[in-house]
Amino acid sequence: DASACNFDALATDNDGTCDYCSCFITTSDTEGYGVDVEVHAVDGVAGYTTYRVYATTASADDFVSAVTGFSGAPLEVQTTGTFFQSSIGGVTPSVVTDLLLGFVPDLAYDSWVTVGLDRKADSGMGEEDAATVSGVSPSWTVGFESGNDITINDGTGGGWYVLNSASNGIAGDDQRVLLGQFTTDGDLSGSMRIQVFPNGNSGMDLRYVASFGAPSCGCTDPDALNPDLDAAYDDGSCEYPGCTDSEADNYDAGADV
């Protein structure tokens, strides 16, 4: 099943191991361009999971310039919980250095937005820190730094970007560019309008919208104690009543409680 997280294009027979709940569902309105979401750390901050979101491109020399949103194509990065923000972190990782990480370990799990970097830019390598822009006051950055969602849906718009001279905007051999790190105690989802210059040509301005979210997983058995009527995939969490004592005459191997 091509929609499974562990889809194997070389497989000829379904062995029943398809997994639908360990990865994110992603969509894009442009073929060859999209987003990836990966788990970067679990419990780096107790009770939180750190995710990294990447733009994926069609070519290694594609240049990712900006992530934006406005009323016609909102930019949203949302959680059902809160985003962790380190006390010395920023909206971008421009303050992250080895020295500071040694003094403040939780800075490694700070939530931030970026283009291609997970620490302070190295100008000697042609790197540039991402800049942010907002069309309204207060800026979206204020709420985000307080642990809230990113939502940019006004008429003027906003987002983050790098100049064409920044080496960190180039996709490279893995054909992807880091767009953000988000540490949350909830479910992560979002939608981004991503600007790309195909093959590094700024005269070819491509803007695509990509979305991501966790699959709807839960107990799909209506006869279980904890059915989830909204779940699309069963994640093995169903609970069944019965005797759980293996020494008893009426032991039920399928019982949980």
Provide a role label for each language-model segment:
Residues 1-257:
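Primarily marks secretory-pathway-exposed extracellular/lumenal segments that are disulfide-
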